[in-house]
Protein backbone atom coordinates (compact mmCIF):
# COMPACT_ATOMS: atom_id res chain seq x y z
CA UNK A 1 0.00 0.00 0.00
CA UNK A 2 1.24 3.50 -0.79
CA UNK A 3 -0.06 7.04 -1.29
CA UNK A 4 0.50 8.22 -4.86
CA UNK A 5 -0.96 11.69 -4.57
CA UNK A 6 -2.02 14.13 -1.84
CA UNK A 7 -3.90 17.38 -2.33
CA UNK A 8 -5.13 19.66 0.45
CA UNK A 9 -7.19 22.84 0.36
CA UNK A 10 -7.50 25.12 3.40
CA UNK A 11 -6.14 22.41 5.68
CA UNK A 12 -4.31 23.85 8.68
CA UNK A 13 -1.79 26.40 7.35
CA UNK A 14 -2.13 25.35 3.71
CA UNK A 15 -4.39 27.28 1.30
CA UNK A 16 -3.38 24.65 -1.23
CA UNK A 17 -0.74 21.94 -1.56
CA UNK A 18 -0.25 19.23 -4.16
CA UNK A 19 2.27 16.41 -3.80
CA UNK A 20 3.01 13.30 -5.84
CA UNK A 21 4.66 10.45 -3.96
CA UNK A 22 6.36 7.19 -4.89
CA UNK A 23 6.89 3.91 -3.04
CA UNK A 24 9.94 3.86 -0.80
CA UNK A 25 11.20 6.60 1.53
CA UNK A 26 10.23 10.26 1.10
CA UNK A 27 11.54 13.05 3.33
CA UNK A 28 9.82 16.40 3.89
CA UNK A 29 12.37 18.89 5.24
CA UNK A 30 11.48 22.26 6.69
CA UNK A 31 11.99 24.44 9.74
CA UNK A 32 9.50 24.23 12.56
CA UNK A 33 6.27 26.02 11.73
CA UNK A 34 6.56 25.59 7.96
CA UNK A 35 3.68 23.08 7.75
CA UNK A 36 5.37 19.75 7.02
CA UNK A 37 3.59 18.01 9.91
CA UNK A 38 0.28 19.41 8.65
CA UNK A 39 0.74 17.48 5.40
CA UNK A 40 1.28 14.09 7.02
CA UNK A 41 -1.48 14.92 9.50
CA UNK A 42 -3.83 15.18 6.50
CA UNK A 43 -2.91 11.63 5.49
CA UNK A 44 -3.45 10.46 9.04
CA UNK A 45 -6.91 12.01 8.92
CA UNK A 46 -7.76 10.07 5.76
CA UNK A 47 -6.71 6.87 7.53
CA UNK A 48 -8.40 7.44 10.90
CA UNK A 49 -10.85 10.37 10.52
CA UNK A 50 -8.98 11.99 13.38
CA UNK A 51 -5.82 13.88 14.21
CA UNK A 52 -2.94 12.73 16.40
CA UNK A 53 -2.53 16.34 17.56
CA UNK A 54 -6.02 17.66 18.39
CA UNK A 55 -9.30 16.16 19.57
CA UNK A 56 -11.68 18.16 17.36
CA UNK A 57 -11.83 19.10 13.68
CA UNK A 58 -12.02 22.89 14.11
CA UNK A 59 -8.22 23.49 14.24
CA UNK A 60 -7.81 21.55 10.98
CA UNK A 61 -9.61 24.23 8.95
CA UNK A 62 -7.43 27.19 7.91
CA UNK A 63 -8.25 30.35 9.83
CA UNK A 64 -10.81 32.50 8.04
CA UNK A 65 -12.23 29.69 5.90
CA UNK A 66 -15.30 27.49 6.36
CA UNK A 67 -14.06 24.05 5.36
CA UNK A 68 -11.00 22.01 4.49
CA UNK A 69 -10.67 19.40 1.75
CA UNK A 70 -8.21 16.51 1.68
CA UNK A 71 -7.79 14.24 -1.36
CA UNK A 72 -5.55 11.19 -1.41
CA UNK A 73 -4.95 8.63 -4.15
CA UNK A 74 -4.09 5.31 -2.52
CA UNK A 75 -2.68 2.28 -4.34
CA UNK A 76 -3.20 -1.14 -2.79
CA UNK A 77 -2.22 -4.34 -4.60
CA UNK A 78 -2.25 -2.49 -7.93
CA UNK A 79 -5.70 -0.94 -7.46
CA UNK A 80 -5.99 2.84 -7.00
CA UNK A 81 -8.77 4.53 -5.03
CA UNK A 82 -9.29 8.28 -4.68
CA UNK A 83 -10.54 9.37 -1.26
CA UNK A 84 -11.90 12.88 -0.72
CA UNK A 85 -12.89 14.27 2.68
CA UNK A 86 -14.60 17.60 3.24
CA UNK A 87 -14.13 18.79 6.83
CA UNK A 88 -16.71 21.33 8.04
CA UNK A 89 -16.65 22.02 11.81
CA UNK A 90 -20.11 22.14 13.33
CA UNK A 91 -21.62 20.22 10.43
CA UNK A 92 -21.48 16.68 9.11
CA UNK A 93 -18.29 15.96 7.20
CA UNK A 94 -18.60 14.53 3.70
CA UNK A 95 -16.68 11.77 1.98
CA UNK A 96 -16.25 10.64 -1.61
CA UNK A 97 -14.65 7.51 -3.01
CA UNK A 98 -13.60 7.70 -6.67
CA UNK A 99 -15.69 10.91 -6.89
CA UNK A 100 -18.88 9.11 -5.82
CA UNK A 101 -20.52 10.07 -2.54
CA UNK A 102 -19.90 7.69 0.36
CA UNK A 103 -22.76 6.85 2.70
CA UNK A 104 -20.84 8.01 5.76
CA UNK A 105 -17.32 9.39 6.23
CA UNK A 106 -16.33 6.22 8.07
CA UNK A 107 -16.96 4.25 4.87
CA UNK A 108 -13.46 5.37 3.81
CA UNK A 109 -11.83 3.65 6.79
CA UNK A 110 -9.55 0.83 5.68
CA UNK A 111 -8.73 2.31 2.27
CA UNK A 112 -5.58 3.88 3.69
CA UNK A 113 -3.79 2.36 6.66
CA UNK A 114 -1.04 4.31 8.35
CA UNK A 115 1.20 3.83 11.35
CA UNK A 116 2.38 7.18 12.62
CA UNK A 117 5.41 7.71 14.84
CA UNK A 118 5.41 11.15 16.52
CA UNK A 119 6.91 12.90 19.57
CA UNK A 120 3.47 12.63 21.18
CA UNK A 121 3.97 8.84 21.34
CA UNK A 122 5.80 9.19 24.64
CA UNK A 123 2.37 9.84 26.20
CA UNK A 124 1.41 6.24 25.43
CA UNK A 125 4.01 5.11 27.95
CA UNK A 126 4.02 7.94 30.48
CA UNK A 127 0.56 9.41 30.05
CA UNK A 128 -2.93 8.65 31.31
CA UNK A 129 -4.84 5.43 30.49
CA UNK A 130 -6.85 7.35 27.89
CA UNK A 131 -3.74 7.58 25.71
CA UNK A 132 -3.34 3.81 25.70
CA UNK A 133 -7.06 3.19 25.16
CA UNK A 134 -6.89 5.46 22.13
CA UNK A 135 -3.89 3.52 20.82
CA UNK A 136 -5.82 0.26 21.12
CA UNK A 137 -9.03 1.58 19.59
CA UNK A 138 -7.31 3.29 16.66
CA UNK A 139 -5.46 0.08 15.84
CA UNK A 140 -8.64 -1.94 16.31
CA UNK A 141 -10.47 0.26 13.79
CA UNK A 142 -7.54 0.06 11.37
CA UNK A 143 -7.76 -3.74 11.43
CA UNK A 144 -11.58 -3.93 11.41
CA UNK A 145 -13.31 -0.64 10.46
CA UNK A 146 -16.68 -1.84 11.83
CA UNK A 147 -15.33 -1.10 15.32
CA UNK A 148 -15.61 2.61 14.52
CA UNK A 149 -19.38 2.15 14.75
CA UNK A 150 -19.10 0.04 17.90
CA UNK A 151 -16.96 2.68 19.60
CA UNK A 152 -19.31 5.46 18.50
CA UNK A 153 -22.35 3.56 19.84
CA UNK A 154 -20.58 2.84 23.12
CA UNK A 155 -19.59 6.50 23.59
CA UNK A 156 -23.16 7.62 22.87
CA UNK A 157 -24.65 5.17 25.39
CA UNK A 158 -22.02 6.11 27.96
CA UNK A 159 -22.94 9.80 27.71
CA UNK A 160 -26.66 9.05 28.07
CA UNK A 161 -26.15 6.67 30.98
CA UNK A 162 -23.80 9.03 32.81
CA UNK A 163 -26.31 11.86 32.50
CA UNK A 164 -29.04 9.59 33.87
CA UNK A 165 -26.82 8.55 36.79
CA UNK A 166 -26.33 12.17 37.75
CA UNK A 167 -30.05 12.95 37.68
CA UNK A 168 -31.04 9.69 39.40
CA UNK A 169 -28.38 10.19 42.06
CA UNK A 170 -29.56 13.72 42.73
CA UNK A 171 -33.17 12.50 42.97
CA UNK A 172 -32.17 9.78 45.41
CA UNK A 173 -30.31 12.22 47.62
CA UNK A 174 -33.37 14.45 47.51
CA UNK A 175 -35.55 11.69 48.91
CA UNK A 176 -37.13 10.27 45.76
CA UNK A 177 -36.07 7.00 44.19
CA UNK A 178 -35.38 8.15 40.66
CA UNK A 179 -36.22 6.08 37.60
CA UNK A 180 -33.99 3.04 38.06
CA UNK A 181 -35.92 1.06 35.45
CA UNK A 182 -34.64 3.41 32.76
CA UNK A 183 -31.15 2.98 34.16
CA UNK A 184 -31.45 -0.80 33.79
CA UNK A 185 -32.28 -0.33 30.10
CA UNK A 186 -29.11 1.72 29.63
CA UNK A 187 -27.17 -0.91 31.58
CA UNK A 188 -28.16 -3.39 28.89
CA UNK A 189 -27.04 -1.09 26.08
CA UNK A 190 -23.74 -0.34 27.81
CA UNK A 191 -23.06 -4.03 28.45
CA UNK A 192 -23.87 -5.00 24.85
CA UNK A 193 -21.66 -2.42 23.12
CA UNK A 194 -19.06 -2.57 25.89
CA UNK A 195 -18.71 -6.34 25.52
CA UNK A 196 -18.13 -5.98 21.78
CA UNK A 197 -15.49 -3.33 22.27
CA UNK A 198 -13.88 -5.22 25.14
CA UNK A 199 -13.74 -8.46 23.14
CA UNK A 200 -12.09 -6.64 20.25
CA UNK A 201 -9.49 -5.10 22.54
CA UNK A 202 -8.73 -8.40 24.29
CA UNK A 203 -8.21 -10.19 20.99
CA UNK A 204 -6.05 -7.31 19.78
CA UNK A 205 -3.83 -7.42 22.86
CA UNK A 206 -3.42 -11.17 22.42
CA UNK A 207 -2.38 -10.64 18.79
CA UNK A 208 0.00 -7.73 19.34
CA UNK A 209 1.73 -8.92 22.53
CA UNK A 210 4.41 -11.09 20.84
CA UNK A 211 5.11 -8.32 18.32
CA UNK A 212 5.67 -5.82 21.15
CA UNK A 213 8.12 -8.16 22.86
CA UNK A 214 10.18 -8.73 19.71
CA UNK A 215 9.98 -5.09 18.57
CA UNK A 216 11.25 -3.83 21.92
CA UNK A 217 14.15 -6.26 21.82
CA UNK A 218 14.99 -5.07 18.30
CA UNK A 219 14.80 -1.34 18.96
CA UNK A 220 16.34 -1.16 22.45
CA UNK A 221 19.42 0.97 22.03
CA UNK A 222 21.69 -0.09 24.89
CA UNK A 223 22.74 -3.35 26.50
CA UNK A 224 21.27 -2.14 29.77
CA UNK A 225 17.79 -2.18 28.25
CA UNK A 226 17.87 -5.77 27.07
CA UNK A 227 20.50 -7.69 28.99
CA UNK A 228 18.75 -8.30 32.34
CA UNK A 229 16.51 -11.33 32.00
CA UNK A 230 13.65 -9.55 33.75
CA UNK A 231 13.47 -6.61 31.33
CA UNK A 232 11.40 -8.27 28.62
CA UNK A 233 8.63 -6.01 27.29
CA UNK A 234 5.05 -7.22 27.52
CA UNK A 235 1.51 -5.84 27.39
CA UNK A 236 -1.49 -6.83 29.51
CA UNK A 237 -5.08 -5.66 29.46
CA UNK A 238 -6.41 -4.35 32.78
CA UNK A 239 -10.21 -4.30 32.90
CA UNK A 240 -12.47 -2.36 35.25
CA UNK A 241 -14.36 -5.63 35.66
CA UNK A 242 -11.71 -6.75 38.11
CA UNK A 243 -12.55 -10.17 39.54
CA UNK A 244 -15.74 -10.26 37.45
CA UNK A 245 -13.58 -10.68 34.35
CA UNK A 246 -13.53 -14.40 33.48
CA UNK A 247 -10.32 -16.20 34.37
CA UNK A 248 -7.67 -15.93 31.68
CA UNK A 249 -9.01 -12.74 30.13
CA UNK A 250 -6.64 -9.80 30.10
CA UNK A 251 -3.62 -11.92 29.19
CA UNK A 252 -2.78 -13.31 25.74
CA UNK A 253 -5.18 -16.15 24.96
CA UNK A 254 -5.29 -18.84 22.34
CA UNK A 255 -8.99 -18.38 21.58
CA UNK A 256 -11.20 -15.37 20.74
CA UNK A 257 -12.93 -13.52 23.55
CA UNK A 258 -16.60 -14.50 24.00
CA UNK A 259 -18.85 -11.43 23.66
CA UNK A 260 -21.78 -13.08 25.47
CA UNK A 261 -19.60 -14.05 28.44
CA UNK A 262 -18.25 -10.51 28.66
CA UNK A 263 -21.74 -8.99 28.39
CA UNK A 264 -22.94 -11.07 31.35
CA UNK A 265 -19.86 -10.10 33.35
CA UNK A 266 -20.45 -6.41 32.61
CA UNK A 267 -24.10 -6.62 33.67
CA UNK A 268 -23.14 -8.36 36.91
CA UNK A 269 -20.50 -5.76 37.73
CA UNK A 270 -22.85 -2.87 36.90
CA UNK A 271 -25.37 -4.29 39.34
CA UNK A 272 -22.68 -4.70 42.00
CA UNK A 273 -21.51 -1.07 41.83
CA UNK A 274 -24.96 0.47 41.32
CA UNK A 275 -24.99 2.26 44.69
CA UNK A 276 -21.51 3.70 44.16
CA UNK A 277 -22.40 4.95 40.68
CA UNK A 278 -25.56 6.68 41.93
CA UNK A 279 -23.59 8.27 44.75
CA UNK A 280 -20.84 9.56 42.46
CA UNK A 281 -22.92 10.18 39.33
CA UNK A 282 -20.45 8.49 36.97
CA UNK A 283 -20.16 5.15 35.15
CA UNK A 284 -17.51 3.16 37.01
CA UNK A 285 -17.46 0.03 34.85
CA UNK A 286 -16.74 -0.50 31.17
CA UNK A 287 -14.02 -0.20 28.53
CA UNK A 288 -13.78 3.56 29.19
CA UNK A 289 -12.22 2.74 32.60
CA UNK A 290 -9.73 0.15 31.32
CA UNK A 291 -6.00 0.38 30.69
CA UNK A 292 -3.25 -1.31 28.71
CA UNK A 293 -0.45 -2.19 31.10
CA UNK A 294 3.02 -1.84 29.57
CA UNK A 295 5.43 -4.06 31.44
CA UNK A 296 9.21 -4.31 31.56
CA UNK A 297 9.81 -7.54 33.36
CA UNK A 298 7.50 -7.46 36.37
CA UNK A 299 7.44 -3.67 36.65
CA UNK A 300 5.14 -1.22 34.83
CA UNK A 301 6.98 0.94 32.32
CA UNK A 302 5.06 3.98 33.58
CA UNK A 303 6.94 5.19 36.61
CA UNK A 304 9.83 2.71 36.36
CA UNK A 305 11.19 2.93 32.82
CA UNK A 306 14.02 5.34 32.08
CA UNK A 307 13.61 8.01 29.41
CA UNK A 308 15.42 5.79 26.91
CA UNK A 309 13.41 2.72 27.82
CA UNK A 310 10.19 4.72 27.51
CA UNK A 311 11.14 5.80 24.00
CA UNK A 312 12.04 2.24 23.08
CA UNK A 313 8.65 1.05 24.34
CA UNK A 314 6.79 3.75 22.40
CA UNK A 315 8.64 2.80 19.22
CA UNK A 316 7.96 -0.88 19.92
CA UNK A 317 4.21 -0.24 20.12
CA UNK A 318 4.24 1.45 16.71
CA UNK A 319 6.47 -1.18 15.12
CA UNK A 320 4.26 -3.92 16.53
CA UNK A 321 1.22 -2.17 15.00
CA UNK A 322 2.96 -2.07 11.64
CA UNK A 323 3.81 -5.77 11.70
CA UNK A 324 0.31 -6.73 12.85
CA UNK A 325 -1.37 -4.74 10.06
CA UNK A 326 1.08 -6.15 7.52
CA UNK A 327 0.17 -9.66 8.70
CA UNK A 328 -3.45 -8.84 7.85
CA UNK A 329 -2.45 -8.49 4.20
CA UNK A 330 -2.18 -4.73 3.64
CA UNK A 331 1.19 -3.26 4.60
CA UNK A 332 0.48 0.20 6.06
CA UNK A 333 2.18 3.45 5.11
CA UNK A 334 4.72 4.41 7.77
CA UNK A 335 4.83 8.07 8.82
CA UNK A 336 7.74 9.28 10.96
CA UNK A 337 6.87 12.81 12.05
CA UNK A 338 9.83 14.68 13.59
CA UNK A 339 10.80 11.50 15.44
CA UNK A 340 14.51 11.48 14.68
CA UNK A 341 15.06 14.79 16.48
CA UNK A 342 13.84 13.07 19.66
CA UNK A 343 16.11 10.02 19.42
CA UNK A 344 19.77 9.45 20.14
CA UNK A 345 22.04 8.34 17.30
CA UNK A 346 21.78 4.64 18.18
CA UNK A 347 17.97 4.62 18.17
CA UNK A 348 17.86 6.65 14.96
CA UNK A 349 20.01 4.10 13.19
CA UNK A 350 18.16 1.10 14.62
CA UNK A 351 14.72 2.48 13.77
CA UNK A 352 15.83 3.29 10.23
CA UNK A 353 17.13 -0.26 9.77
CA UNK A 354 13.83 -1.70 10.96
CA UNK A 355 11.55 0.38 8.70
CA UNK A 356 13.69 0.96 5.60
CA UNK A 357 12.17 -2.06 3.83
CA UNK A 358 8.57 -0.85 4.16
CA UNK A 359 6.65 -0.22 0.95
CA UNK A 360 6.34 3.49 1.73
CA UNK A 361 7.91 5.59 4.49
CA UNK A 362 7.13 9.30 4.84
CA UNK A 363 9.52 11.24 7.08
CA UNK A 364 9.38 14.84 8.31
CA UNK A 365 12.45 16.56 9.72
CA UNK A 366 13.59 20.08 10.53
CA UNK A 367 17.18 19.17 9.67
CA UNK A 368 17.93 16.82 6.78
CA UNK A 369 21.03 15.50 8.55
CA UNK A 370 18.83 14.05 11.33
CA UNK A 371 17.45 11.47 8.87
CA UNK A 372 19.54 8.28 8.63
CA UNK A 373 20.99 7.43 5.24
CA UNK A 374 18.70 4.38 4.87
CA UNK A 375 15.69 6.71 4.58
CA UNK A 376 17.12 9.47 2.37
CA UNK A 377 15.02 8.86 -0.72
CA UNK A 378 12.90 11.45 -2.51
CA UNK A 379 13.13 14.83 -0.79
CA UNK A 380 10.71 17.76 -0.62
CA UNK A 381 11.65 21.13 0.85
CA UNK A 382 8.81 22.82 2.74
CA UNK A 383 9.33 26.55 3.04
CA UNK A 384 7.21 29.72 3.15
CA UNK A 385 3.97 28.03 2.13
CA UNK A 386 5.45 26.05 -0.74
CA UNK A 387 6.47 22.43 -1.25
CA UNK A 388 9.27 21.86 -3.75
CA UNK A 389 10.70 18.53 -4.84
CA UNK A 390 14.49 18.50 -4.72
CA UNK A 391 15.91 16.77 -7.78
UniProtKB/Swiss-Prot annotation:
GO cellular component, one term: cytoplasm
Entry's localization field: Cytoplasm
Transmembrane segments: none
Predominant location: cytoplasm
Biological processes annotated in GO: DNA replication; DNA synthesis involved in DNA repair; double-strand break repair; SOS response
Alphabetical keyword list: ATP-binding, Cytoplasm, DNA damage, DNA repair, DNA replication, DNA-binding, Nucleotide-binding, SOS response
Pfam families: SMC_N
Gene3D superfamilies the UniProt entry points to: P-loop containing nucleotide triphosphate hydrolases, RecF/RecN/SMC, N-terminal domain
Keyword ATP-binding included in the entry's annotation: yes
Residue sites binding ATP per the record: 30-37
GO molecular function, one term: single-stranded DNA binding
Functional description taken from the UniProt entry: The RecF protein is involved in DNA metabolism; it is required for DNA replication and normal SOS inducibility. RecF binds preferentially to single-stranded, linear DNA. It also seems to bind ATP.
UniProt cross-references to PANTHER family, sorted A to Z: DNA REPLICATION AND REPAIR PROTEIN RECF (PTHR32182:SF0)
Family: Belongs to the RecF family.
Protein name: DNA replication and repair protein RecF
Lineage: Bacteria, Bacillati, Actinomycetota, Actinomycetes, Pseudonocardiales
Gene name in the database record: recF
Amino acid sequence: MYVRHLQVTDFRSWPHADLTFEPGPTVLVGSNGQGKTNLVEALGYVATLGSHRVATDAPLVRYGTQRAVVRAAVVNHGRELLVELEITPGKANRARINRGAAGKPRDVLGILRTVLFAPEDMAMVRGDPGERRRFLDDLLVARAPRYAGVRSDYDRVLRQRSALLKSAGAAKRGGSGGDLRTLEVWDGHLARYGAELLAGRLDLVAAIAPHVTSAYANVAATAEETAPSGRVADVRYRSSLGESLPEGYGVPRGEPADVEVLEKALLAELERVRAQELERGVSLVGPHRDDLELMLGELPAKGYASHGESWSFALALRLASYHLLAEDGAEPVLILDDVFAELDRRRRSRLAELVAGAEQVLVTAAVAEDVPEELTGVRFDVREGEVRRVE
